[in-house]
């Protein structure tokens, strides 16, 4: 008796088709999670800048003296997903890299009647899903149009 060994062409083609279908579903989902992780990295990068601006306002009395590189506010550093961070008069501006399709986050502090700072901001990107993710993670009430 002759026994066949191996796979038939049809079996191999079905396997390739199944892998292609799974890849077409999985890769976009993976890219979405990568972008969300990048926005989360952006959020984490703002913490020392926000804290420094708040301390600067406490010591100096107003936001106009709170600039990057002075009054304890760190100079702008880039990270894996952030192209640049600037602080001018207490306004923190972050510009994302190509992973974030040009996401720009502008965070503005305003003093309330108790002398505390309230942070508001706008996320602007060519990709609306990144803007929405930014709005959600940062807790902003406004999303800029890309």
Which residue stretches match the model-derived regions?
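N-terminal single-pass transmembrane signal-anchor helix
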Residues: 1-41, 45, 49
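Intrinsically disordered, low-complexity regions enriched in small/polar residues
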Residues: 5, 32-35, 51, 83, ...
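Generic hydrophobic alpha-helical segments
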Residues: 29, 37, 53-56, 114
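N-terminal alpha-helical signal peptides/signal-anchor transmembrane segments
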Residues: 42-63
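Periplasmic/extracellular, small/polar-rich flexible segments of pilin-like filament-forming proteins
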Residues: 57-146
